[in-house]
Amino acid sequence: MNRIEHYHDWLRDAHAMEKQAESMLESMASRIDNYPELRARIEQHLSETKNQIVQLETILDRNDISRSVIKDSMSKMAALGQSIGGIFPSDEIVKGSISGYVFEQFEIACYTSLLAAAKNAGDTASIPTIEAILNEEKQMADWLIQNIPQTTEKFLIRSETDGVEAKK
């Protein structure tokens, strides 16, 4: 594979990653009942993610990258997302926040590499879009890490209160 083929492959992977993120965020947002700040931020990032998918599809189209291969990449990313997400136990909200942060860091690393590949492949038209997506992922990761302590504290208080659901 040459540098352009690698770049195109990684663009397909980024698209698949965002499709998986969309599913994970939709699932998480639908289960959150008692943590309105977290739910609102996840819903905001879900909206960003849907926009990122459209932006990545524009890049794929501009580079004449076939969408038929995307299905294979999507199944790889689905497996990764499920392994990161897992099935949440009684402390679902805390583990979900941690898993979300880990996934955001994975996305940050992927987009950092994709940005370098875009520059190396000479796809200057896509650089601002990739930089913008990278920035959104960093903002979400920052928000999660800053709010994990408060989510954990709220969970601990709720878990010790009789008749109050804490996990979600």
From Swiss-Prot:
Q: Which Gene3D superfamilies match?
A: 1.20.1260.10
SUPFAM superfamilies in the cross-refs: Ferritin-like (SSF47240)
Q: Which InterPro entries match?
A: DUF892_YciF-like, Ferritin-like, Ferritin-like_SF
Protein name, as recorded: Protein YciE
